[in-house]
């Protein structure tokens, strides 16, 4: 009989969001008339920008002609999109990133997991706690951890607590690590890093030969012009960091799928014999072997993000969701609930009232307010006693959800 990958058996009972879906399904079957408002999973709700829709329509029509048809595209992405990304997202901010260093993909979630394909299994790994679960679970699946303890923490991972006491800013690891995941603006806490904080991480990584995997999926939501959007705005980051970005949240591409990863040329790791190896070459080889590229139609839609019309429309989308976040913060604060985040990120991280545990508060909101959020403990042991609410919904639903919560 075929052997399974037993590392999957080490995973906790369920990935956070499937467990939420299971509880919602059970509740909805018992309460079919309940009008649920979902402020849980970070899926957008507003329509795709018109500039992107029009660009995709043109691309579809092109595909219906002999001269405009496109089959397999380059695995790394079309040059015109890579150049637009490099120019608008990096070079305009002083980052020395060129088009060849951009790899277009179908999701930063995929890339942050798939990057493990090119990294050795003996690397010592650090994650924040709480943390986006994919970083942990992908390492478990790949056999890079031991078993989980009672709190859900896995042997072989270094956990860096982030909480109100430390301003949701992890401290530099006290034990040696080779690989660290950083996410700013942070999911789930909504915290953001200053230039000085990122410079400290880059200095640490360069001094200790550590690779930073930097998730910047929510950078478009940063409101303060003095805060960095990319780790490559920090001196020395090209030598120690890979960055993941996405069109999902700023341009509403959760259903159309387009993202990109930046792997600077010259960024190196060690082979088994101790020689230096460029990670760009390995990632390029990995993508060429395991990925067929994002569709031409979708990439044309993503390119339109960088048009004048597209920029105006995605800025309006971001402003819409950030207004939702401001409403959530205001109403929860008025209800006497301690809140964090929601100022430079579409997530509000709240302290559960009355010492309720995270899943208890989830069930409380579901049963009594018919509002769905995300239990903080699902993001790690240090998330216990916290809860995440997402700003991704209509204004009407956000207002109604807050009315219901305040009425509890």
UniProtKB/Swiss-Prot annotation:
Substrate binds at residues 15, 42, 109, 132, 187, 292, 388. Pathway: Amino-acid biosynthesis; L-lysine biosynthesis via DAP pathway; LL-2,6-diaminopimelate from (S)-tetrahydrodipicolinate (aminotransferase route): step 1/1. InterPro entries: Aminotransferase_I/II_large (IPR004839), DapL/ALD1 (IPR019942), PyrdxlP-dep_Trfase (IPR015424), PyrdxlP-dep_Trfase_major (IPR015421), PyrdxlP-dep_Trfase_small (IPR015422). It holds the Pfam family Aminotran_1_2. Coiled coil: none annotated. Its EC number is 2.6.1.83. Its cofactor is pyridoxal 5'-phosphate. The keyword Chloroplast does not apply. Pyridoxal 5'-phosphate binds at residues 72, 108-109, 132, 187, 218, 246-248, 257, 292. GO terms for molecular function: L,L-diaminopimelate aminotransferase activity; pyridoxal phosphate binding. The modification N6-(pyridoxal phosphate)lysine is found at residue 249. Homodimer. Belongs to the class-I pyridoxal-phosphate-dependent aminotransferase family. LL-diaminopimelate aminotransferase subfamily. Involved in the synthesis of meso-diaminopimelate (m-DAP or DL-DAP), required for both lysine and peptidoglycan biosynthesis. Catalyzes the direct conversion of tetrahydrodipicolinate to LL-diaminopimelate. This is LL-diaminopimelate aminotransferase. It comes from Prochlorococcus marinus (strain MIT 9313).
């Amino acid at each position: 009989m075929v052997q399974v990958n037993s590392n999957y058996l080490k995973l906790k009972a369920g990935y956070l969001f499937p467990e939420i879906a299971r509880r919602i399904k059970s509740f909805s079957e018992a309460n079919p008339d309940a009008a649920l408002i979902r402020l849980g999973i970070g899926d957008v709700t507003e329509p795709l920008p018109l500039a992107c829709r029009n660009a995709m329509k043109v691309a579809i029509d092109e595909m219906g002609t002999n001269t405009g048809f496109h089959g397999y595209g380059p695995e790394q992405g079309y040059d015109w999109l890579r150049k637009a990304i490099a120019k608008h997202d990096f070079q305009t901010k002083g980052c020395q990133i060129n088009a060849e260093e951009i790899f277009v993909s179908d999701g930063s979630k995929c890339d942050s997991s798939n990057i493990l394909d090119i990294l050795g299994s003996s690397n010592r790994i650090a994650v924040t706690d709480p943390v986006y679960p994919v970083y942990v679970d992908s390492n478990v699946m790949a056999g890079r951890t031991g078993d989980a303890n009672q709190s859900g923490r896995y042997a072989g991972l270094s956990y860096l607590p982030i909480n109100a006491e430390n301003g949701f800013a992890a401290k530099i690891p006290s034990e040696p690590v080779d690989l660290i995941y950083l996410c700013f603006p942070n999911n789930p806490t909504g915290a953001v890093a200053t230039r000085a904080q990122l410079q400290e991480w880059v200095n640490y990584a360069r001094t200790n030969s550590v690779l930073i995997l930097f998730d910047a999926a929510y950078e478009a939501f940063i409101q303060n012009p003095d805060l960095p959007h990319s780790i490559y705005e920090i001196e020395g980051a090209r030598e120690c960091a890979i960055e993941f970005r996405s069109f999902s949240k700023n341009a509403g591409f959760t259903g159309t799928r387009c993202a990109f990863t930046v792997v600077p040329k010259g960024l190196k790791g060690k082979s088994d014999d101790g020689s230096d190896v460029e990670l760009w070459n390995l990632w390029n080889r990995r993508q060429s072997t395991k990925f067929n590229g994002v569709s031409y139609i979708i990439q044309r839609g993503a390119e339109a993000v960088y048009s004048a019309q597209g920029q105006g429309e995605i800025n309006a989308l971001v402003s819409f969701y950030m207004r939702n976040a401001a409403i959530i913060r205001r109403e929860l604060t008025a209800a006497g609930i301690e809140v964090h985040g929601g100022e430079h990120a579409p997530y509000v991280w709240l302290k559960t009232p009355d010492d309720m545990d995270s899943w208890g508060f989830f069930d409380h909101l579901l049963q009594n307010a018919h509002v769905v959020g995300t239990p903080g403990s699902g993001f790690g042991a240090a998330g216990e006693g916290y809860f995440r609410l997402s700003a991704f919904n209509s204004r009407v639903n956000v207002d109604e959800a807050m009315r219901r919560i305040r009425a509890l």
